[in-house]
């Protein structure tokens, strides 16, 4: 009798977090539809083509998903190894963008590098790098972070260099986001409450001084406090955004039927996309988007907790840092649009128009998916080991 043929080995499956995937695809889809709705008139003005911006955004999303697929294949141990050199690369990029003739200047700020036809906003790259760097630092120096204020100050000194370079662009909003990411990660990394609170007070004081040191920031603050008094100058953008939400009421005026995007509301397809959504989809659409971002943050923290329970501290901290970044930036963008916060110039993650930011954020989400996959595989291998 011939020997029995060996049983085929089961195909290896890449476990994807279905909840997180659904949320990301919904945000990308809603964002694309709203970018299309808010930019058609601009496409006619720029290129006599209503599909000019929607087509470019579709290309950005496809490139972002391709980049995410590549990032998904990188094990977390490699990110842990390259955290420090990656931070140096980030500082170099922040310096390069300030070189006259190299950095691309838009609306008075030099924040972009042109690469293969795409404008890469260096601050978005630096946010991701800061997450990886901080996760590596806290993992290596866990005792110092927990028991010494100098353990908290060391990485912040390096991040302050990045923040100064960002302020030179100027990009105050991104500098704030990076510091919030760092502080949040150190708190979740086990920093003692008393030195942490003292550090928060120090950084907040420094931020307040910086915010009041530039005339345009002071104007933003005064217009935020009473936008209707400055409705024709510094408060114009905010009042137009508030009008958008007022017109939208509960169910909106209908997709594509908004008026504020028609050259009344500046940056309607980028920083103020949420206002257009509020006008056209109303409270229903606004609530849906807030719920999606809330789900993303909650699910991201859950993945971080699973990684920490599995002993993968670096991966856990990266997960925490990524969701702090996405959650805080989304909160600030929506808060600015609704008049809760002063204007900051931050995009709505995975939704606003933009090539470089879309690619970076898709890549960042891929890292979160990778953490979930590795934790799931580790859990499966532990179960198999116990059953033997």
Curated annotation (Swiss-Prot):
GO terms for molecular function: lipid-linked peptidoglycan transporter activity; peptidoglycan glycosyltransferase activity. It comes from the Bacteria. InterPro entries: FtsW, FtsW/RodA. Residues 1-19, 79-85, 138-147, 192, 293-315, 370-388 are cytoplasmic. GO terms for biological process: cell wall organization; FtsZ-dependent cytokinesis; peptidoglycan biosynthetic process; regulation of cell shape. The keyword Electron transport does not apply. It is an enzyme of class 2 (transferase). It is a multi-pass membrane protein. It is found in: Cell inner membrane. It catalyses: [GlcNAc-(1->4)-Mur2Ac(oyl-L-Ala-gamma-D-Glu-L-Lys-D-Ala-D-Ala)](n)-di-trans,octa-cis-undecaprenyl diphosphate + beta-D-GlcNAc-(1->4)-Mur2Ac(oyl-L-Ala-gamma-D-Glu-L-Lys-D-Ala-D-Ala)-di-trans,octa-cis-undecaprenyl diphosphate = [GlcNAc-(1->4)-Mur2Ac(oyl-L-Ala-gamma-D-Glu-L-Lys-D-Ala-D-Ala)](n+1)-di-trans,octa-cis-undecaprenyl diphosphate + di-trans,octa-cis-undecaprenyl diphosphate + H(+). Residues 41-57, 107-117, 169-170, 214-271, 337-348 are periplasmic. The chain crosses the membrane at residues 20-40, 58-78, 86-106, 118-137, 148-168, 171-191, 193-213, 272-292, 316-336, 349-369. Its EC number is 2.4.99.28. Keywords: Cell cycle, Cell division, Cell inner membrane, Cell membrane, Cell shape, Cell wall biogenesis/degradation, Glycosyltransferase, Membrane, Peptidoglycan synthesis, Transferase, Transmembrane, Transmembrane helix. Belongs to the SEDS family. FtsW subfamily. This is Probable peptidoglycan glycosyltransferase FtsW.
């Amino acid at each position: 009798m011939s020997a029995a043929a060996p049983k085929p080995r089961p195909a290896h499956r890449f476990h994807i977090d279905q909840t997180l995937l659904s949320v990301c695809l919904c945000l990308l889809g809603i964002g694309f539809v709203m970018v299309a709705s808010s930019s058609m008139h601009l496409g006619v003005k720029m290129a006599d083509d209503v599909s000019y911006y929607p087509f470019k955004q579709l290309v950005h999303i496809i490139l972002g998903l391709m980049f995410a697929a590549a990032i998904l294949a990188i094990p977390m141990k490699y990110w842990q190894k390259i955290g420090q050199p990656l931070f140096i690369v980030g500082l170099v990029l922040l310096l390069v963008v300030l070189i006259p003739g190299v950095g691309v200047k838009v609306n008075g700020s030099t924040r972009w590098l042109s690469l293969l036809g795409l404008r890469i906003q260096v601050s978005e790259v630096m946010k991701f790098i800061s997450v990886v760097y901080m996760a590596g630092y806290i993992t290596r120096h866990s005792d110092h972070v927990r028991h010494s204020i100098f353990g908290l100050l060391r990485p912040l000194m390096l991040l302050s260099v990045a923040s100064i370079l960002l302020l030179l662009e100027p990009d105050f909003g991104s500098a704030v986001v990076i510091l919030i990411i760092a502080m949040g990660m150190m708190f979740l990394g086990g920093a003692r409450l008393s030195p942490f609170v003292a550090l928060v007070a120090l950084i907040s004081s420094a931020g307040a001084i910086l915010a009041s040191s530039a005339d345009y920031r002071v104007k933003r603050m005064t217009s935020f406090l009473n936008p209707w008094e400055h409705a024709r100058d510094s408060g114009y953008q905010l009042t137009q955004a508030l009008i958008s939400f007022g017109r939208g009421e509960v169910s909106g005026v209908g997709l594509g039927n908004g008026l504020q995007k028609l050259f009344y509301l500046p940056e309607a397809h980028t920083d103020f996309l949420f206002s257009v959504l509020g006008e056209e989809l109303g409270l229903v659409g606004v609530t849906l988007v807030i719920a999606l971002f809330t789900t993303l943050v909650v699910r991201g923290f859950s993945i971080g907790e699973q990684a920490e329970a599995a002993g993968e501290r670096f991966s856990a901290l990266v997960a925490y840092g990524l969701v702090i970044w996405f959650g805080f930036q989304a909160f600030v963008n929506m808060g600015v649009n609704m008049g809760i916060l002063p204007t900051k110039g931050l995009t709505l993650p995975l939704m606003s128009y933009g090539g470089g930011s879309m690619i970076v954020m898709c890549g960042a989400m891929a890292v979160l998916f990778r953490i979930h996959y590795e934790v799931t595989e580790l859990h499966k291998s532990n179960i198999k080991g116990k059953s033997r």
